[in-house]
Structure formats: C-alpha cells, structure tokens
Amino acid sequence: MKKVVVDASVAAKWVVEEAHSAKAVRLLDCDEIHAPDHWLAEAVNVLWSKVLKGDLDAKDANERMTVLTRSPVIATPIAGLMASAFAIAVEHSVTIYDSLYIALAEERAFPLLTADEKFVRRFQDTPLSKRVTWVGDLG
C-alpha cells in the first residue's frame, strides 16, 4: 500500500507491543500515512491509560509519545471532515472520533487501516467496508 489512512489503534501499536504490532510498524514504510489531526491525542491517550494501569512508567510513556509526535503521519484538520464524519456517525452508530478516520479515507479514496476489530465489523455489510481493513489481515 502506497497511501493509507491509519487510526489511533494502529499508531498506538507503533509504540506499544501488542498483537499485530509488527504489521502496524510495517505500515510506516508506506509512501504516505494520513490521519485526522486528532489521531495523536487518541494514540497518546493509550499511553496515558497504560501508565494509569501500571503497565508503563511515565518516563517510558513520555519517550514513546515523542516517537509518535515524530512519526510521518500527515495530519488533516478535522473541520473539513466534520460534515461527512457526522453523517457517517449517525448512519452507522459510531463515534465522531472514529467516523473522522473513515471520512478522511473516503475523501482521499485511500484504505483505512485499523486494529479495532469491532470497528471493522461495524462496517462489514455496508458500502464503506471496501475502505476499512483490519491490520491483522495484512500479509
């Protein structure tokens, strides 16, 4: 894949070792990686959660946050995506946060890569399913 949209669940796997992290890391080799500009807050929230649970110490989480802030993601302002994201959210009963990713993927005609299986299932039998790919299905 040359140009992709990734969500925060994929970006978090760049810095937190979990199932399919290696597949997520390989996406960093794509020519272009896009995300709505709220992606970073969502990905860093994963680190915060790991600190709260005692899975990471704050210093380590801070270093991983720095890796995320330096990642090659092309962030798109969410204001221009909001109308389509809202329509997607209402039609498919997903959060605005999640629908922003698929709105961007639709706008750019790029695949959306996610590590969120529930999100993939939400769009399984809809026309948007062609846009959404679970990172676990990558080769």
Predicted regions and their residues:
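Short, conserved alpha-helical segments within structured domains
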Residues: 39-40, 60, 81, 101
